[in-house]
């Protein structure tokens, strides 16, 4: 199994269990999340569910919780929304911190393509939920989540150059 860590903080953000699609010249990875019910245990001990007051359309058990698989698996922490000014300040600092960690062609590709990826992110800024890794470091990579038109499940965007592949 491959795990992808935040290059700056070491927080685990993604694994190969969640397939990704490269967009914006490989600067961003697009990953489909999914709402799942966690903690629901269906115990059927009787032969007559209607006599027990149990029906299949009752909804979700009190102890069951709906979570997004990626957020739950990697214990991502939701952050307050960013306005344009806050986001530009963040991305400038992130680029400054990340660039020296990249080598050779990766650094050149990053410098060449990060501006268009940043513009793409800015165009969707109002639609995003923002997440960081479990450690909640100041220098963490942001993970962006949004809902595509008509989708009930969130799509996540990762800044690909800021991820480090680790074999488990």
UniProtKB/Swiss-Prot annotation:
The keyword Calcium applies. It holds the Pfam family TCTP. InterPro entries: Mss4-like_sf (IPR011057), Mss4/transl-control_tumour (IPR011323), TCTP (IPR034737), Translation_control_tumour_CS (IPR018103), Translational_control_tumour_p (IPR018105). The keyword ATP-binding does not apply. It is found in: Cytoplasm. One of its GO terms (cellular component) is cytoplasm. One of its GO terms (molecular function) is calcium ion binding. Belongs to the TCTP family. Involved in calcium binding and microtubule stabilization. This is Translationally-controlled tumor protein homolog. It comes from Solanum tuberosum. The gene is TCTP.
